[in-house]
Amino acid sequence: MADNSHTRVVVGMSGGVDSSVTALLLKRQGYDVVGVFMKNWDDTDENGVCTATEDYKDVAKVASKIGIPYYSVNFEKEYWDRVFKYFIAEYKKGRTPNPDVICNKEIKFKAFIEYANQLGADYVATGHYADVKRDENGRMHLMRAKDQHKDQTYFLSQLDYKQLDKVMFPLAGYTKPEIRKIAEEAGLATADKKDSVGICFIGEDGHFREFLSQYIPAQPGNMETLDGKVVGQHMGLMYYTIGQRRGLGLGGNKESNEPWFVIGKDMKKNVLYVGQGYENSHLYATHLEASDIHWVDDVVSRYGRDFHCTAKFRYRQTDVGVTVHLSDDDQMVTVEFDDPARAITPGQAVVFYDGEECLGSAIIDRAYSHDRQLQYV
């Protein structure tokens, strides 16, 4: 076994089971492991307990158990400036952002790496389910994890090969049940801790509307069909996303008992467009346009500006076949679908894959059905 004792790995520890086992596995492999808890948001739960404080206590328990030093670093300002302001700005435009993608790019793999360097890190590691592979030229590639259900390359798709050069993903070859078993057998305090869900600054109780209304004044308005018939009232366009069914408060009517879905928004008129039926044609797009393009490595030299690959438009979606057309100035990408795709949502990431490799992503701006732009924002 290689002597890893002179290689320092700084592990981002959240107080969850995945990052706990990440630190444990690296310690067992003989690395000089240091744990760091990132405090990105000042939050209290419904009992007035700061959830970050509770998570940090779990980090302390795990670090003490496996015998590694640990620190806490406060990234609240960086998170506010680089992630949260973006999140609010996108909602103001009527879009549905994915803050996890931006948080990984700006905080967990930028601010955190800079901090880890101050601790003398040779590498950083996180509990993400993903993998990295170095090619013959020494360039890093982002690869899917073994556990396809947990694979998180979707959220890591705006990283580049330089950021990945110093990154380890020790959970790449494990499934979630295996990770829980390792934690249990090692007696880690986080072994049975449930996975965190939702956005970190909203928490798991899901009071999304209440939270968002603190930052953006809600403007109620009409819910209409595309032919202008008013069928209800919306609470504020920012609360709805394309393809949404729940929370509309609309039942069937004499023409149809099919459920209603959000099929569009008009920000200028403050109208939420709704239509009946899961297969409603207004939910299906033939292509999209996206910007804010980030490739893990230079795709143009590998594939050219026009190429076929697969893509996801949301986390845990099955890959679909697409043809990518990259503009000459690299500012815009047009993505044509092999088959019409449902509920393409502006503000979300479209993430590109070649087999097991994640090539990168872009942020969706517009969706089209043939030549007609869908009324999505």
UniProtKB/Swiss-Prot annotation:
CDD domains assigned to the protein according to its UniProt record, in alphabetical order: MnmA_TRMU-like
State where the protein is found.
Cytoplasm
Which residues are annotated as active site?
C103 (nucleophile), C200 (cysteine persulfide intermediate)
Top-level class of the enzyme under EC nomenclature? transferase
InterPro entries under this entry?
MnmA-like (IPR004506), MnmA-like_C (IPR046885), MnmA-like_central (IPR046884), MnmA-like_central_sf (IPR023382), Rossmann-like_a/b/a_fold (IPR014729)
A Gene Ontology biological process annotation? Answer: tRNA wobble position uridine thiolation
Q: According to the UniProt record, which cysteines are disulfide-bonded?
A: C103-C200
EC number(s) on record?
Answer: 2.8.1.13
Which stretches of sequence are listed as region Interaction with target base in tRNA?
Answer: 98-100
Q: Does the keyword ATP-binding apply?
A: yes
Family annotation (NCBIfam families): PRK00143.1, trmU
Q: What is the designated name of this protein?
A: tRNA-specific 2-thiouridylase MnmA
